[in-house]
Amino acid sequence: MSENVSSHIAIVPAAGVGSRMKADRPKQYLLIDGKTVLEHTVEKLLAHPQIAKVVVAVTEGDPYYPELSIALHPDVIRVAGGKERADSVLSGLNYVSAQLPCEWVLVHDAARPCVTLNDIDRLIDVCCAHPTGGILASPVRDTMKRANKENNIDHTVDREALWHALTPQMFKTQQLTRALADALQQGVAITDEASALEWLGETPALVQGSANNIKITQPEDLALAEFYLSRERG
């Protein structure tokens, strides 16, 4: 583990509905081995020695969250989520700035329960020595095709410098807050935290992480996540 003993705060935007799962509830509340996806994710973050607290942004009136084991955990704080991911993250950042001042925050997808502590440790090590921060990422392995308007292949994209963006993504609290607030105010499309920093002209680090750190998006992803988690437990 990293020798850096400072504590950081993690923010988990969990206000999404996950319509592609075609389930009766948002994907973060689907079960894997008796626990919700969100519980697995938050517990994984809390297990890292350098993460002091986890701020979870959920929809106001969410009927599922109060029933979770993490809802009463002393190191888990609930804040109101927003319409878009960036709104939820900004809500978490505003809480952190007001109540839990810290230099760095890690933002992690609610639907990525398979992140490893070693990957988080490596991310923290790299980011704390980087002027901007960075993200976990995985190099693209497959041949990539760009489609034309008819959904036929237009050309093959050089994958040499292409990476899949994963999470957590770790940035300085004040800089990320400013980037997201300014981008939202100007109507800039922000798909992840790194894109907000890129919009400011920054160049975040790419920290190679495990491709097993999947985001649960489709129904078949649940079984794959369960496999990875069970293998991790041994």
Curated annotation (Swiss-Prot):
It catalyses: 2-C-methyl-D-erythritol 4-phosphate + CTP + H(+) = 4-CDP-2-C-methyl-D-erythritol + diphosphate. GO terms for molecular function: 2-C-methyl-D-erythritol 4-phosphate cytidylyltransferase activity. Signal peptide: none annotated. One of its GO terms (biological process) is isopentenyl diphosphate biosynthetic process, methylerythritol 4-phosphate pathway. Pfam families: IspD (PF01128). The record marks 20, 27 as: Transition state stabilizer. Coiled coil: none annotated. The record marks 159, 215 as: Positions MEP for the nucleophilic attack. Pathway: Isoprenoid biosynthesis; isopentenyl diphosphate biosynthesis via DXP pathway; isopentenyl diphosphate from 1-deoxy-D-xylulose 5-phosphate: step 2/6. Gene3D superfamilies: Spore Coat Polysaccharide Biosynthesis Protein SpsA, Chain A (3.90.550.10). Its EC number is 2.7.7.60. This is 2-C-methyl-D-erythritol 4-phosphate cytidylyltransferase.
